[in-house]
């Protein structure tokens, strides 16, 4: 589990940063680390997103895990994959759930398997 703590810290930092940029005055964060899986939940009261922007964010979070890319593309994956912070978050997680409503905020739940 210790090997995953660095990834969790980076993911939480990126999500909190985005919440603050979206004007949130309240950000709730919960991390549940259990055998086999880590669940990261962030909910804010920021500007929220319309359906079009929400779809773009979902696409960014739906990146394949980086270790899966490296297996497929070899060492080139790390150099050729350039994207937003959320794309990087997507590459560190297995599954994302996101909901948002304009002027009401955003809720993101991310799941990362810890068993190899």
Residue ranges of model-derived segments:
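Conserved beta-strand-loop-beta-strand hairpin that lines the nucleotide-binding pocket
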Residues: 21, 25-116
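Conserved short strand/loop->alpha-helix "switch" segment adjacent to the catalytic nucleotide/phosphoryl-transfer site
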Residues: 1-16, 20, 74, 78-81
